[in-house]
UniProtKB/Swiss-Prot annotation:
Gene3D superfamilies named among the record's database cross-references: Bira Bifunctional Protein, Domain 2 (3.30.930.10), Class II aaRS and biotin synthetases, domain 2 (1.20.58.180)
Keyword Membrane in annotation: no
Protein name: Glycine--tRNA ligase alpha subunit
SUPFAM superfamilies: Class II aaRS and biotin synthetases (SSF55681)
Superkingdom of origin: Bacteria
Coiled-coil ranges from the UniProt annotation: none
Subunit structure: Tetramer of two alpha and two beta subunits.
Entries under InterPro entries matching the protein: aa-tRNA-synth_II/BPL/LPL, Gly-tRNA-synth_heterodimer, Gly-tRNA_ligase_asu
CDD domains: GlyRS_alpha_core
Gene: glyQ
Length: 315
């Protein structure tokens, strides 16, 4: 199965089971959890079933395109099921069959591994999924997002597409994976991404302007506050956010951008251990403010995705 067909198969599998198939977020994210289709929609009582591919960028993980399985950009396939169904594990195993891997013929293990994202103030009870000694997925029950309890709990499935493709094609290097094969015309993963890995690794480790990134982080932080406290001074005593006026989605966009600026600075070695914790705390505070405002906003709107009776019960 090619990399391209792997994505198409998972999309069809989850679409057939009631998931919306949405598109990747159009900003740099470290994981699919940063996509607002996860971070925001996992909050509050409204049901939400969605699946999407998320190109994920982690600047410090770059290896100039020389490491066979470690990159600064990779792809996750993320599924959010809210509320989490009782048979979520069975659905996951069924999805493995859809991509040509019968769990009965392989050593599939769920190894306890609770998940946490300090910058997002998020955590969940979870398991790594290993097949024949290789980790291919993460399975999580979200407990908190932005420091807010998740009620109901969402089930998250995250497929590591590169690892799965290497496993299915029996390749030792991600760059040898067949991305597409149409009538014998083969395009490999490395044909598309290997040069990009070298360029972005060079940028992240050597060329990123440190002063500009520090300044941009401050701008992002200020924008989040301005967009949430729209029409009020966030520094004023007693200032409060009006959820109906707040621009939650643009504010969250700047949270994501601030997190990426921090990650680039971290890759450049520009942040000390002490500063690192302080910056994580700053991003987490922004994420929490956005999450709280989003929850208040959805309530003020009457929970549009709930039926009328459910909305009244949730109030």
């Amino acid at each position: 199965m090619t990399f391209q067909d792997l994505i198409l198969t998972l999309q069809k599998f989850w679409a057939d089971r009631g998931c919306l198939i949405v598109q990747p977020y159009n900003s740099e994210v470290g994981a699919g959890t940063f996509n607002p289709a996860t971070f925001l929609r996992a909050l509050g009582p409204e049901p939400w079933n969605v699946a999407f591919v998320e190109p994920s960028r982690r600047p410090a993980d770059g290896r100039y395109g020389e490491n066979p399985n470690r990159m600064q950009q990779f792809h996750q396939f993320q599924v959010i099921l809210k509320p989490s169904p009782i048979d979520i594990q069975d659905l996951y195993l069924e999805s493995l069959r859809a991509i040509g891997t019968n769990p009965l013929d392989h050593d599939v293990r769920f190894l306890e591994d609770d998940w946490e994202s300090p910058t997002l103030g998020a955590w969940g009870l979870g398991w790594q999924v290993w097949i024949d000694g290789l980790e291919i997925s993460q399975f999580t029950y979200f407990q908190q997002i932005g420091g807010i309890d998740c009620r109901p709990v969402s089930g998250e499935l995250t497929y590591g597409l590169e690892r799965i493709a290497m496993y299915l094609q029996d390749k030792d290097s991600i760059y040898d994976v067949v991305y597409s094969d149409r009538g014998g015309k083969i395009v490999r993963y490395g044909d598309i991404y290997q040069r990009a890995e070298w360029e972005w690794s060079t940028y992240n480790f050597e060329e990123a302007d440190i002063a500009e990134h520090f300044a941009a982080f401050d701008v992002c932080e200020a924008e989040v506050k301005r967009l949430l406290y729209r029409g009020a001074d966030p520094a004023a005593k007693g200032a409060a956010i009006d959820p109906k006026k707040a621009l939650v989605l643009p504010a969250y966009d700047f949270v994501v951008k601030a997190a990426h600026r921090f990650n680039v600075l971290d890759a450049r070695g520009a942040i000390s251990v002490t500063e690192r914790q302080r910056f994580i705390g700053r991003v987490r505070a922004l994420a929490r403010a956005v999450a709280e405002t989003y929850v208040a906003q959805r309530e003020a709107l009457g929970y549009p995705l709930l039926g009328e009776q459910q909305a009244k019960a949730a109030e």
